[in-house]
Swiss-Prot record:
Annotated EC: 1.14.11.9
Domain annotation Fe2OG dioxygenase: ranges: 193-293
Similarity comment: family membership: Belongs to the iron/ascorbate-dependent oxidoreductase family.
Gene that encodes the chain: F3H-2
Record protein name field: Flavanone 3-dioxygenase 2
Cofactor: Fe(2+); L-ascorbate
SUPFAM superfamilies in alphabetical order: Clavaminate synthase-like (SSF51197)
Gene3D superfamilies the record matches: B-lactam Antibiotic, Isopenicillin N Synthase, Chain
PROSITE patterns: FE2OG_OXY
Gene Ontology biological process: flavonoid biosynthetic process
Pathway: Secondary metabolite biosynthesis; flavonoid biosynthesis
Function: Catalyzes the 3-beta-hydroxylation of 2S-flavanones to 2R,3R-dihydroflavonols which are intermediates in the biosynthesis of flavonols, anthocyanidins, catechins and proanthocyanidins in plants. Converts (2S)-eriodictyol to (+)-taxifolin and (2S)-naringenin to (+)-(2R/3R)-dihydrokaempferol in vitro.
Catalytic activity: a (2S)-flavan-4-one + 2-oxoglutarate + O2 = a (2R,3R)-dihydroflavonol + succinate + CO2
Superkingdom of origin organism: Eukaryota
Organism expressing this protein natively: Oryza sativa subsp. japonica (Rice)
Amino acid sequence: MAAEAEQQHQLLSTAVHDTMPGKYVRPESQRPRLDLVVSDARIPVVDLASPDRAAVVSAVGDACRTHGFFQVVNHGIDAALIASVMEVGREFFRLPAEEKAKLYSDDPAKKIRLSTSFNVRKETVHNWRDYLRLHCYPLHQFVPDWPSNPPSFKEIIGTYCTEVRELGFRLYEAISESLGLEGGYMRETLGEQEQHMAVNYYPQCPEPELTYGLPAHTDPNALTILLMDDQVAGLQVLNDGKWIAVNPQPGALVINIGDQLQALSNGKYRSVWHRAVVNSDRERMSVASFLCPCNSVELGPAKKLITDDSPAVYRNYTYDEYYKKFWSRNLDQEHCLELFRT
């Protein structure tokens, strides 16, 4: 009972916070400086239903090169399903504390867990976030262990996982073609990919200028597909040395290049720094889906992209090696890919 009580206490979503607990307060030099954020900038938007395939491929390539992030519209995932995913996520975080405590763990190796911050075992300052982490592929292997409450959770999230995986594979094809590679290159090279999900919950924060939902980081995987709360902004992307706010566009999904696609592109495409900030007015939720290479597959720059004028930027490695290195460090240290340069 004592351990369960401690787990409940760890979660931000179990209470309303009128004051800022000290363990969330960043040193002054590490605070988000919200007054310097560019609020009216835009990241590229790509219409996947455009009949001009060449234009879609070109737009995806340009976005990967210049921003590392883009939004997609007309992506084929039904708006009603997207709304259901967000609603069932909110229902989960509103469950009684004792119900949520059944899933709590601070062990990053667990495939299904509810936790808080990022890596509470290593951190000295925590982040203003609770999250439910799920492994999603193959579905039949993991769904039985997913939350049984809310009752519709497994069906809704399972359907979304299947559709978002197919969207990811379509995007791989466009990304491959934009690099001058065969359309199937990325999917084939990355092997039988794992798929993870993080359902992120950012409660109202009494002093948002003192902390983060997540500090600046890059994603260690290949491709991330983010479903954002279309009522509350919070994602910010580093572009040309400035933090820009990603303003939610109804019906859109946000795509970002992970570290592995930067490596496969030989540095042509960018896995960029991004962060999540919080606010004092409203809670916020997001659902991030991660496509991850097979652990044992060898990764490195595509041979076709290595020339005398453009030698290999990164050495070959396995995703297992990369992921272990990523988790052994603090989230906001130097870009993990720097450790794999030739």
